[in-house]
Amino acid sequence: LPVNQRTALEQLLFFNVNQHRVRVGIQQSIETYGVPEIHEQDGGLRVRVGDIDGVQTLFAVSDIGRLLGVAVFVRSAHERFAVLHLGVDPRLSMTPELNTRVLLKLMHEIRSTARRTRGVDRIELVYKDRHAVRLHG
């Protein structure tokens, strides 16, 4: 994500008006994995979480370059990815089908990455009481 999108990313991760819907999950993620931080790397923005190595950040960006969503995940055990943080631009909640499409696209990309990663067969959604979804074939 370009550095000039820092404010949009801060709004999405830290000041999202919809955070109250998943407050318990956010607290659980922070207690377990650490606080997310935005940092610059190789001329772009990334999110790191606590002192965990291998945290990956996935951005959903519109055709005109507007940040629509973010997913932060890590390989938490040999066989699973943990989705630590997931956020969508709150303005999209006025258009539920677009909001859902962005969330589904982010999860689809994480699932695709998991399928390409040897040994990973589950995706854990930390916001949903650590619910793990098994990947099939």
Predicted regions located by residue number:
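Short amphipathic alpha-helix that is part of the acyltransferase structural core
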Residues: 1-42
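Contiguous hydrophobic segments
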Residues: 2-18, 56, 117-137
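Serine/threonine-rich low-complexity intrinsically disordered regions
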Residues: 2-4, 18, 48, 62, ...
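Short linear motifs in intrinsically disordered
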Residues: 4, 46-50, 112-114
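A signal for specific C-terminal beta-sheet/loop modules enriched in small/flexible residues
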Residues: 4-11, 58-63, 73, 82-86, ...
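A conserved beta-strand-loop-helix scaffold within acyl/acetyltransferase catalytic domains
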Residues: 27-32, 36-80
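Acyl-donor binding region in acyl/amide transferases
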Residues: 76-136
